[in-house]
């Protein structure tokens, strides 16, 4: 069973992902197996190591890249078993920074070098409070108004971004890449992908409820959309992903329409999971930058 989906006995790291990325920094990172082209034009020399404390005492390890305190500021959120060292967030940070944005990215709890709280992720139930803490940090430490803040997430980070309005609407726009939309379906599909029967989700769910006192489906992306201020969404989806199936994006688009939320959608028949920024970097950057500039007022 995937450690990333149901937890592990150590902090959540897929060594095949984490170890090759562990030396990445905003000013020098590789794309690893994601792509073979040179990303050096997206390196950011001027960045700050930061620590952000959540309401429940978790310390989040992050990097902050600032152009101008009055500029649009985007929070970048990584995927499960990944970290702020991932090119999924560093490449996008470089794209945005070079276009004049500020950018904050951090390790979710139990990921990277943030506090190893309980060696498990909580399907976003706790991680949304990490996002809230990062928004509060930008306000309190960097004097960034919420009117200038947007969110970007890839995969698990995208799902958490969709869930965030259930506890705070202090941001103006959200960009998501290959987001899961229904966690229960995601786990069942992952179990099948790994060669296990899908019904094993039920004991996993009850284990978390009984032993960790966490309801893994208490807050869902749909709940986040329902509670939102109808912040506009830009949605990117590689339809060939074997892990987060294309129906999750179908469901997201339908839910956003039902709630009257404006969406921009780019779907790619030829791409797999979180590949768009590597396969079509110029197109991706242009769409992302124009979206945030159109929906966040500096």
Question: What does each model-found stretch correspond to?
Answer:
Residues 31-69:
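N-terminal cap/lid segment of alpha/beta-hydrolase-fold proteins
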Residues 250-298:
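C-terminal catalytic histidine-bearing segment of alpha/beta-hydrolase fold enzymes
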Residues 93-115:
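Conserved alpha/beta-hydrolase
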Residues 1-7, 11-12:
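Single conserved hydrophobic/aromatic residue that forms the stacking wall/gate
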Residues 121-142:
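Alpha/beta-hydrolase active-site loop
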Residues 228-229, 234-237, 241:
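Short beta-strand/loop motif that positions the catalytic acidic residue
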């Amino acid at each position: 069973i995937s450690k990333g989906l149901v937890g592990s006995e150590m902090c959540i790291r897929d060594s095949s992902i984490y170890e090759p990325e562990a030396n990445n920094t905003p000013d020098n990172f590789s794309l690893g197996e994601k792509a073979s082209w040179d990303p050096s034009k997206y390196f950011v020399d001027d960045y700050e190591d930061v620590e952000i404390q959540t309401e429940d005492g978790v310390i989040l390890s992050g990097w902050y890249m600032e152009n101008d305190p009055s500029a649009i500021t985007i929070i970048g959120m990584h995927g499960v078993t990944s970290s702020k060292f991932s090119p999924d967030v560093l490449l996008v940070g470089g794209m945005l920074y070079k276009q004049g944005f500020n950018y904050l990215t951090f390790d979710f709890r139990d990921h990277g070098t943030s506090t190893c709280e309980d060696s498990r992720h909580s399907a976003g139930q706790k991680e949304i409070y990490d996002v809230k803490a990062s928004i509060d940090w930008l306000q309190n430490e960097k004097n960034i108004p919420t009117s200038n803040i947007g969110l970007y997430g890839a995969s698990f980070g995208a799902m958490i971004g969709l869930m965030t309005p259930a506890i705070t609407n202090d941001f103006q726009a959200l960009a998501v890449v290959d987001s899961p939309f229904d966690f229960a379906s995601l786990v069942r599909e992952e179990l099948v992908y790994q060669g296990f029967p899908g019904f094993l989700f039920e004991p996993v769910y009850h284990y978390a409820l009984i032993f960790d006192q966490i309801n893994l489906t208490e807050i869902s992306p749909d709940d986040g959309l329902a509670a939102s201020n109808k912040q506009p969404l830009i949605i990117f989806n590689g339809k060939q992903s074997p892990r987060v199936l294309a129906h999750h994006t179908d469901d997201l688009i339908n839910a956003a329409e039902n709630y009257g939320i404006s969406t921009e959608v780019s779907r790619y028949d030829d791409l797999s999971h979180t590949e768009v920024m590597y396969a079509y970097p110029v197109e991706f950057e242009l769409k992302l930058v124009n979206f945030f500039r159109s929906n966040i007022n500096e």
